[in-house]
UniProtKB/Swiss-Prot annotation:
Catalyzes the isomerization between 2-isopropylmalate and 3-isopropylmalate, via the formation of 2-isopropylmaleate. The gene is leuC. It comes from Chelativorans sp. (strain BNC1). Heterodimer of LeuC and LeuD. The lineage of its organism: Bacteria, Pseudomonadati, Pseudomonadota, Alphaproteobacteria, Hyphomicrobiales. [4Fe-4S] cluster binds at residues 350, 410, 413. It comes from the Bacteria. CDD domains: IPMI. This is 3-isopropylmalate dehydratase large subunit.
């Protein structure tokens, strides 16, 4: 009888090709997602070595990081470096026989939104991409994580990846989420609890009543930010919610293949008594809407709280780090979070650019107007999300309220396209990183949920969404 295994153990074992005496492992990779930023050198390496892509049918290429999101993007990309990267991906996709969604394809969008939409992401799979937020796909009970450019080339050439097995970590979130508290607040609370290095060397499995109650889109939000907690990957065991989301997707199994796949998926759960190297527990009932105040995702505080006093931190290194964060963010200790005035609001990204996120924001925006000082933008995560939102009339709600309705792409999550903050601008953002300069040189980022961002756009400052009338 085999020892009890975790979900991570099972998927890792099922894909193990070889294990060396020193613990180095070779894993088979089921799915490889590719975008324009981390792939050019990888494809050039294949070309120079005279190699083909081993399994083009297991590879999907999408442009997302560099593409403009303005309505006039059909006229081309102005930035030369961005244009070259996008053109290179188009050429490489043709040369190597890979399916490719360009900016004119309605299926185009952020790679981590497109994969699940197409049924390319399935439970029990190993999934990689040259992007740290590949952990998003772990919401389906997949082992998904980012890889570097040299590893991108290795996977393209061999459909395998050299790895060492990570440790197991369980994050148990029990209880019922209060009204106004979302999946984004769950993951920000987790990162606030464990810190940005808390998951280092581990794969996190998220479990508990609050996690099970989330939709697939909420689960993707949680898994998306596993890397911000330092983890190699994050995952949630599949269940009926998972199967309902996947069924009838374009790339999902059909007929008898579906039944066979589902039978396997139902084995993908952690066995009773399986060992976790670390266990963290949170009570969802006690979670508030959360806002980040500093320049790290671990710098979290309740919307009803105050900017902390760095001088009260005992550890000298951490104290100096938080003092720098306060200086960079232009904040004074003791300031009420709801007194922080904003300049910009960004709703989108692979964390919160899905249809449920837009619905949540539209519910707040309907019948209201964006504050005169605020420049607010809504960027759907894919062309299909945009089409669905427009079919539901969400675009009209946003436009009438004064939001800018954009085309799909990574947009202001990172300063690699035309959407970026100016120095000193302060933004409420539904993205995943608030590092210095992440959204633009000297830009100041506060991470929040879509509903919190929409309310901030209207009020001009942060508000407690639980008291929103």
């Amino acid at each position: 009888m085999t020892a009890p295994r975790t979900l991570y153990d099972k998927i890792f074992d099922d894909h193990l090709v070889d294990r060396q005496d020193d613990g180095t492992c070779l894993l088979y990779i089921d799915r490889h997602l590719v975008h324009e930023v981390t792939s050019p050198q990888a494809f050039e390496g294949l070309r120079m070595a005279g190699r083909a892509v081993r399994h083009p049918e297991k590879t999907l290429a999408v442009v997302d990081h560099n593409v403009p999101t303005s309505p006039d993007r059909k006229f081309g990309i102005k930035n030369e470096e961005s244009r070259i990267q996008v053109e290179a991906l188009a050429k490489n996709a043709v040369d190597f026989g890979i399916e490719y969604y360009n900016e004119a394809d309605r299926r185009q969008g952020i790679v981590h939104i497109v994969g699940p939409e197409q049924g390319f992401t399935l439970p029990g799979m190993t999934i990689v991409c040259g992007d740290s937020h590949t952990s998003t796909h772990g919401a389906f009970g997949a082992l998904a994580h980012g890889i570097g450019t040299s590893e991108v080339e290795h996977v393209l050439a061999t459909q395998t990846l050299i790895q060492r097995k990570a440790k197991n970590m369980l994050v148990q979130v029990d209880g019922k989420l209060p009204d106004g508290v979302t999946a984004k607040d769950i993951i920000l609370a987790i990162i606030g609890e464990i810190g940005t290095a808390g998951g280092t060397g581990h794969v996190i499995e998220y479990a508990g009543e609050a996690i099970r109650s989330l939709s697939m889109e909420g689960r993707m939000t949680v898994c998306n930010m596993s890397i911000e907690g330092g983890a190699r990957a994050g995952m949630i065991a599949p269940d009926e919610t998972t199967y309902a989301y996947i069924k009838d997707r374009p790339r999902a199994p059909k007929g008898a293949a579906w039944e066979m796949a589902r039978a396997y998926w139902e084995t993908l759960h952690t066995d009773e008594g399986a060992h976790f190297d670390r266990v963290v527990k949170l009570d969802a009932a006690n979670l508030p809407p959360i806002v980040t105040w500093g320049s790290s995702p671990e710098d979290v505080v309740s919307v009803t709280g105050y900017v902390p006093n760095a001088d009260e931190i005992q550890d000298e290194t951490k104290r100096l780090s938080k003092k720098r964060a306060l200086e960079y963010m232009g904040l004074t200790a003791g300031t009420k979070i709801t007194d922080i005035a904003l300049d910009r609001v960004f709703i989108g990204s692979c964390t919160n650019g899905r249809i449920e996120d837009l619905r949540a924001a539209a519910k707040i925006a309907e019948g209201r107007k964006v504050h005169p000082r605020i420049n607010a933008m809504i960027v759907p995560g894919s062309g299909l999300v945009k089409a669905q939102a427009e079919a539901e009339g969400l675009d009209k709600i946003f436009i009438e309220a004064g939001f800018d309705w954009r085309e799909p792409g990574c947009s202001m999550c990172l300063a690699m396209n035309d959407d970026r903050l100016k120095p000193g601008e302060r933004c409420a953002s539904t993205s995943n990183r608030n590092f210095e300069g992440r959204q633009g040189f000297k830009g100041r980022t506060h991470l929040v949920s879509p509903a919190m961002a929409a309310a901030a756009a209207i009020a001009g400052h942060f508000v407690d969404i639980r008291e929103w009338k």
